[in-house]
UniProtKB/Swiss-Prot annotation:
<feature type="binding site">
    <location>
        <position position="121"/>
    </location>
    <ligand>
        <name>FAD</name>
    </ligand>
</feature>
<keyword id="KW-0521">NADP</keyword>
<dbReference type="InterPro" id="IPR050097">
    <property type="entry name" value="Ferredoxin-NADP_redctase_2"/>
</dbReference>
<dbReference type="Pfam" id="PF07992">
    <property type="entry name" value="Pyr_redox_2"/>
</dbReference>
<keyword id="KW-0560">Oxidoreductase</keyword>
<dbReference type="InterPro" id="IPR023753">
    <property type="entry name" value="FAD/NAD-binding_dom"/>
</dbReference>
<dbReference type="GO" id="GO:0050661">
    <property type="term" value="F:NADP binding"/>
</dbReference>
<dbReference type="InterPro" id="IPR036188">
    <property type="entry name" value="FAD/NAD-bd_sf"/>
</dbReference>
<feature type="binding site">
    <location>
        <position position="47"/>
    </location>
    <ligand>
        <name>FAD</name>
    </ligand>
</feature>
<feature type="binding site">
    <location>
        <position position="87"/>
    </location>
    <ligand>
        <name>FAD</name>
    </ligand>
</feature>
<comment type="similarity">
    <text>Belongs to the ferredoxin--NADP reductase type 2 family.</text>
</comment>
<dbReference type="InterPro" id="IPR022890">
    <property type="entry name" value="Fd--NADP_Rdtase_type_2"/>
</dbReference>
<dbReference type="GO" id="GO:0050660">
    <property type="term" value="F:flavin adenine dinucleotide binding"/>
</dbReference>
<keyword id="KW-0274">FAD</keyword>
<feature type="binding site">
    <location>
        <position position="322"/>
    </location>
    <ligand>
        <name>FAD</name>
    </ligand>
</feature>
<comment type="subunit">
    <text>Homodimer.</text>
</comment>
<protein>
    <recommendedName>
        <fullName>Ferredoxin--NADP reductase 1</fullName>
        <ecNumber>1.18.1.2</ecNumber>
    </recommendedName>
</protein>
Length: 331
């Protein structure tokens, strides 16, 4: 059997990366297992060009830039990254170690920290006839490269933060931006909705999508007013569907932890119902928790410090980062 790790972090999103950094500061041998072929979670996969506004110290930061900073930070302590593997099951061994079984092999660890966010995810489809045949051309479910929309007529559908944020970000780049929502009110943050209404974005509410037409790509979209049945046909060079994502925790649902909807109940120490298994970030829940990256950043050190005590009961209480970081780097 290979030498076990002190902690194995399941999930390589922003909270998982910060957890890896902090466990490195606590001089723990650290492994990160990520089911996607790249680190960064939804930020890197779905929203790399999107700005984030609620990270302390950054008035705004592009998602990919935040991921790059987190990777640079975590890599100070050379954690082991395992990409493209999905954890299927765990087993407590007689010697107290935890054996993690993935779709490609086995991993041995003393503790586990779950930072899998909302789990695996898939975009909710556009939901009209023949739409799927345009998914390889000009129907998009997320925006990876802003420049591809330069000087083009872009129609976005949705009423949440992503739809509003992308509309505002594409406004100075695209030839025109139209945002269509089936309700009168948007679910996005109040401030960004105010920015939307003060922008040049053409806002259409409450309209539902009836059909799309086109040969090799979507050329027109037909909308019906939800109250008056008025029909409007809108031309488009690109269509961005922001109806959200369906997420699943997959095999984690079989673990002997307490679930609350799609999250795992933890206590104030980030402990789950399984000894030695902790959770932080959006996969964790407790009374009053707010689903923000910033919240997960605060939970990560709690989980790591508790895991450290299990690995080494004689470990001292963590010091401030300045003295701790210098001590570890000079070790």
């Amino acid at each position: 059997m290979h030498q076990p790790y002190d902690v194995t972090i399941i999930g390589g999103g922003p909270v998982g990366l910060f957890t890896a950094f902090y466990s490195g500061m606590r001089q723990m041998k650290t492994k990160v297992i990520e089911s996607l072929p790249q680190l960064g979670g939804q930020l890197a996969t779905l929203y790399p060009e999107k700005y984030i506004y609620d990270i302390a110290g950054f008035p705004k930061v592009k998602a990919q830039d935040l991921v790059d900073r987190l990777l640079e930070q975590a890599n100070e302590f050379d954690p082991t990254y395992v990409l493209g593997e999905t954890v299927l099951a765990y087993e407590r061994l007689d010697d107290g170690l935890i054996r993690l079984v993935t779709n490609k092999g086995e991993h041995y660890t003393k503790t586990v920290i779950l930072t899998a966010g909302n789990g695996s995810f898939a975009a909710r489809p556009l939901g009209v006839a023949d739409a799927e045949r345009f998914e390889g051309s000009n129907l998009h479910y997320f925006v990876n490269e802003m420049d591809r929309f330069k000087d083009r007529q872009v129609v976005l559908l949705g009423g949440g933060d992503s739809a509003v944020d992308w509309s505002l970000m594409l406004e100075p780049i695209a030839k025109s931006v139209t945002l269509v929502h089936r309700r009168d009110k948007f679910r996005a943050h109040e401030h960004t909705v105010e920015l939307l209404h003060n922008s040049s974005v053409n806002v259409m509410t409450p309209y539902t999508l009836e059909s799309v037409t086109g040969e090799d790509s979507i050329e027109t979209l037909t909308f019906k007013h939800a109250e008056t049945d008025e029909v409007i046909v809108v031309g488009a060079d690109d269509v961005v569907c922001n109806f959200g994502f369906v997420s699943s925790l997959g095999p984690l649902k079989e673990w002997e932890v307490e679930f609350e909807r799609n999250s795992i109940r933890v206590n104030s120490k980030m402990e789950t119902a399984i000894p030695g298994v902790f959770a932080c970030g959006d996969i964790a829940t407790y009374d009053g928790r707010v689903k923000l990256i910033a919240t997960g950043f605060g939970e990560a050190p709690i989980a790591v410090n508790q895991a450290k005590l299990l690995v080494d009961p004689s470990a001292r209480h963590p010091q401030h980062s300045t003295s701790l970081f210098e001590k570890v780097k000079n070790h």
